[in-house]
Amino acid sequence: MVKLTGFSKASPAERIEKLALAGLLSEEGLQTVRDNDTLPLSLANEMVENVLGTLALPFGLAPGFQVDGQEIQVPMVTEEPSVIAAASYAAGLIKRSGGFKTQVHKRQMIGQVALYEVSHKEKASQAITEAKEELLQLANQAYPSIVKRGGGARDLWTEVKGDFLICYLSVDPKEAMGANMLNTMLEALVDPLEDLSEGQGLMAILSNLATDALVTASCHIDYRFLSRDPKEAAEIAQKIALASQLAAVDPYRAATHNKGIFNGIDAVVLATGNDWRAIEAGGHTYASRSGQAQGLSSWIAHPDQQVLEGQLTLPMPIATKGGSIGLNPSVQVAHDLLGNPDAQTLARIIVAVGLAQNFAALKALVSTGIQHGHMKLQAKSLALLAGASPSEVAPVVQALLEDKPFNLEKARAVLENIRQSN
């Protein structure tokens, strides 16, 4: 078991040494972190258009997650204060109750060929269904390398929606996210589908609603870890369950509820070089599958067992290969810190982080209030914006916390007073 005692109170250099002592990174990985070695400008210029430079974000670590019995140190990239601290807090508390359990329901991507001007949709649908095996073979022939790796096209079906006959294709992309793979296969099917349907192909494109790549994370938290006061612990558990119910019935709350989940998910997706926009799009669409936006997680209080049960399910078509994953040295460090998991394991970890983030947010909301934990972080941000040096931040923060409410103007005044007194 890796112990990173005092990690949150250490300096960045001390944290890196703790990683070295724990054997979590190779010497090359340690050097990458020490040198703050990120994406070279020359490489960035080859990745996107009209490059001017690169934009850095804080790269942190949430230690002590236990997922399916394995201890995981989770890299997170985010500019938002409190996200990493909240994830770490929740991970530690949930680990004491047995950690997170996860389930990968399936891992396949879905794409579609939309057909229009189909005069006889039922007849066309039947013709496509009868040609299913031949169409799957054509799809695999369009991308033979994935078949060699054990993946490839798995299923094909049609649905009539409005004026469209839509042909869906599901593909096992193995360790890749599979966008290019799927699009190549789909485009290879357009001509034969037009012939079979006697219609026109409108578009062939993957879908970011990856309902064939659902992952569930769950946890059970003993009431005694919610508060030392048994009555207060039971009240917190009940309020967290009520907060979950609120997100299920009110889309205004659901949007913020789910945004909090993605505070954690996006941070890990970004750290591991994955497409956070695709994950967000799929997650938020999945949350609205009933016709109304709802919370992605659910929490149930069990007073008889003195246990709070949490669960989160969402599409997680994450990758460990392909795209820009191998280009950024910091991304490789993130994968190393995680133990270089395969795509399914990485998906399990990410959904567990989302559930941890959700628990931390809900517990704060129904007990101390969200601003209580944010005050010190807000004061620190104001101190930095006011121009405080690293040695000046702590006294400015202390002065602001002792004189609420505070703002940037007050932070500047406090900083000026500190400098004059020195």
Labelled PLM ranges:
Residues 97-129, 287-351, 357:
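A structural-propensity feature for long, helix-poor, extended segments
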Residues 58-83, 174-182, 248-273, 354-363, ...:
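Conserved phosphate/anionic-ligand binding catalytic regions in large, soluble enzymes, centered on
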Residues 308, 315-422:
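Catalytic-core signal marking the mid-to-C-terminal active-site face
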Residues 1-72, 76, 80, 100, ...:
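Acidic/polar, glycine-rich intrinsically disordered N-terminal extensions of enzymes
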Residues 1-45, 50-51, 88, 92, ...:
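Alpha/propeptide regions of enzymes that mature by internal proteolysis
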Residues 44-49, 53-162, 166-170:
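Small-residue-rich
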Residues 33, 99-105, 142-155, 196-208, ...:
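Flexible, glycine/charged-enriched surface loops at secondary-structure junctions
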